[in-house]
């Protein structure tokens, strides 16, 4: 029977069919090659938006810098970055007037956080620009290298383990006349491979010391590396994102802590909450506007879009905001928080890998690194690239472009939200002093604006006033891309509202399926995703049951573990059939061992091992979960593990799932190729840091009570904690006298070893 697809939607309101229009099936687009062009676009655009600002030269680095603050007032609708300081400060003052004590309280909370945050906070995060090697590294390695180089230069305050002390070292490093760094260099040599007896090129990385003068060091400390943002759906062009180095990261973290604390207290802020909590917050604002717009008033909502939010924001404006927010606070606190915006107003954007050239007959390929772009003959480039390079040349210093205005993606999401909310706050009747008033929602650069007025003229006047207020603060609402509707239908951060939020199920599509971690985790994640979508995203029972069957099928094909009584032949079927035949209780076999699927939509919350435990043969239980079985994963498995799932918008989010250690929770080994290179040392460092941090976490689980604060080293802290815990356990009868004595002996041994060292 042919189905006319339009019939499917006859009974469905258009908004509920929104899912079908989203570009979320199939693989997302990835970028290939270098991000140099995209970065140049960003730098050039940012300068263009602020072109009528004042040019100055940075006395330390010699970089030309453009300052658009308090620039000309706009004469047309083109996007500009000319924020007016007095307007921003006034918006902050009104925000404080509407929320008495908000800044004061947030400052106190932040001071407490600053006292307690440890350096290992900076090991969280993916790629980080490592200024010692001039390339990206995992966060833990980049931090380790930075601390190692600081120590080499006599900066050792950070050894206390507190983040604030590490930041003191950073400040001090910027005053030094020269910094000695340890950097890597590559040597290639031909050697004979033992296994294959062929000649291979072996690359070794040596470490060498190098001196940087003050200018060279400052340039590196202020550099943000750039990459192309991958996997962005629904866009034709790629765009560049930035990774800051370790010097900037800690300062940004504290500013964002303060801003987060403020956002939590603002009802119009879509950050830092997410999911259902966010929906509830939004629904409240809408409800308020609809109840107040009785029969006498009209209420309209704008689904807003801002033009190039990041490129028109300005770090100098953020400095003004912070100066105001912290105005009655201690000097040290104000200083710590003002460093991040100051560093950002002097930032340099690294242009990435440069350009790849190929000769016509494809015989020759050559890479033109970014450092060469300032001097190379431009006749080799096509027109558009030539224009980009010509424009950016005056800004180039050692392969990085001076970029004073603009914020780069994702650096101050919370603080820029505070700025946006301060405009929404000005819409109250007592401030507009006319018949119209507004309110709305702000989440980073995304906003929804609800305007109420007695008639259409009033609505128009309200929107115009909002638009102009935004302009004064360096925010450019796009008239082309924003649209207005009667209140009750709008979109905000990909949530679609129609008298309540409509589930946008397509968003979750990418996270369905087999994750590819291991058999145990994949089963657990798969059913958890289905469970979560039944709770949060209107996934109905019938569809969920179907999703479950599809998932099990997908899982069996991925791991070649079809049921023991199936006819399908795979590499594993021989072993699986053998197991099937010798198992008495076949229902007890895990799906990954060829067993039947016992999941249905009622028991998705139970880990498979627990679900089938009572049904298993005794010897199968013994093999599956025996800690002495060498195939049972010994990676300390927490009772709850975190998986990274890819929702369609926003960063990859972590999702908790239950983990039971069995023979199926294996951890794949690292690729051999890295172990044969000189990177091996880096890898070992990284694993060591990982182990130390994990060990420390074990001693001080964040849930128990506050992390140790003070000057003791990590080892001392762990030893003293071990002693306290042992005594408590001994006195409460949880451990025997011999165990207690042994723990005390081990602690003393550790202390002796430390003294000898």
UniProtKB/Swiss-Prot annotation:
TM stretches of this protein: none
Cysteine disulfide links: none
RdRp catalytic domain boundaries: 286-483
Residue ranges, annotated region (Promoter-binding site): 249-256
Catalysed reaction equations from the record: RNA(n) + a ribonucleoside 5'-triphosphate = RNA(n+1) + diphosphate
Record-level Gene Ontology MF annotations: nucleotide binding; RNA binding; RNA-directed RNA polymerase activity
EC number of this enzyme: 2.7.7.48
Compartmental location: Host nucleus; Host cytoplasm
GO cellular component, one term: host cell cytoplasm
Keywords recorded for this protein, A-Z: Eukaryotic host gene expression shutoff by virus, Eukaryotic host transcription shutoff by virus, Host cytoplasm, Host gene expression shutoff by virus, Host nucleus, Host-virus interaction, Inhibition of host RNA polymerase II by virus, Nucleotide-binding, Nucleotidyltransferase, Phosphoprotein, RNA-directed RNA polymerase, Transferase, Viral RNA replication, Viral transcription
Coiled-coil regions listed: none
Post-translational events: Phosphorylated by host PRKCA.
Role this protein plays: RNA-dependent RNA polymerase which is responsible for replication and transcription of virus RNA segments. The transcription of viral mRNAs occurs by a unique mechanism called cap-snatching. 5' methylated caps of cellular mRNAs are cleaved after 10-13 nucleotides by PA. In turn, these short capped RNAs are used as primers by PB1 for transcription of viral mRNAs. During virus replication, PB1 initiates RNA synthesis and copy vRNA into complementary RNA (cRNA) which in turn serves as a template for the production of more vRNAs.
Family: Belongs to the influenza viruses polymerase PB1 family.
Protein name per its UniProtKB record: RNA-directed RNA polymerase catalytic subunit
